[in-house]
Regions:
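Residues at alpha-helix caps and immediate loop-helix transition turns in enzyme cores, especially N-
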Residues: 100, 104, 138, 142, ...
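Generic C-terminus detector
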Residues: 33, 111-112, 149, 157, ...
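Active-site-proximal substrate-binding core of FAD-dependent oxidoreductases
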Residues: 122-128, 183-186
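Mid-domain catalytic core of redox enzymes
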Residues: 1-110, 114-115, 120, 145
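A conserved FAD-binding loop/helix module that cradles the flavin
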Residues: 157-185
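FAD-binding beta-loop-beta segment adjacent to the flavin cofactor pocket
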Residues: 68-78, 129-164
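Conserved beta-strand scaffold positions in the cores of enzyme catalytic domains, especially
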Residues: 121-124, 155-157
Length: 186
């Protein structure tokens, strides 16, 4: 028996199993992690939505507003640094080319600088998240069919992406405890 936390669509592809229902959709996200000199109008918030950003992102978050340990040790005492993540959504699996990522990163840094969120970026690190948000077609039975097919082969799906559901960290921890308890007696 196997406990699996990989995204359901990837697990189905890896195993070669198929079901009758069409696969449910998902969204991918490009995350720009930015270490920067804090600008004069850098918000104190954990994150903000910007659906009208010219460079195309939808959310900007401030790691260092959540916890200063997201800053380099040398910058924690100074109030002049900020660590940021910037998210841009894409249709599932439609990863941009390296040239597109580079152009987007430059445009995003320029926009954040114009807004006064940052003075200058010191580090920009893009990360592609293939399965970031999962969805279900109305009336879909794909998740149930796929989960049953995998269980028939001893593969038990736990966690947000494996179960193709939106859930928080507490739900994922609960799933882990339940799954571990069910294996304990066998």
């Amino acid at each position: 028996r196997v406990l699996c936390t990989l995204p359901l669509n990837h697990t189905m592809a890896m195993t070669g199993l198929t079901v009758e229902a069409r696969p449910d959709p998902y969204s991918s996200v490009l995350v720009l992690n930015i270490g920067a000199v804090k600008g004069p109008r850098c918000p104190p918030h954990h994150w903000l939505y910007h659906p009208d950003a010219k460079s195309g992102f939808h959310r900007v978050g401030f790691y260092s507003n959540v916890d200063h340990s997201f800053l380099p040790t040398s910058a924690r005492e100074r109030a002049s640094a900020v660590s940021i993540y910037v998210e841009r959504a894409y249709p599932g699996g439609q990863e941009p080319s390296p040239a597109e990522v580079s152009a987007y990163a430059e445009a995003t840094v320029r926009e954040l600088t114009e807004w006064g969120y940052i003075e200058r970026a010191e580090v920009v690190d893009p990360t592609w998240i293939d399965v970031a948000y999962t969805w279900q077609w109305p009336g879909s039975t794909y998740t149930a069919q796929a989960t049953r097919a995998l269980q028939a082969h001893g593969i038990y799906m736990i966690g947000r992406y494996a179960r193709w559901s939106f859930q928080g960290i507490a739900d994922s921890i609960r799933d882990g405890f339940y799954a571990g308890a069910s294996f304990k007696d066998s």
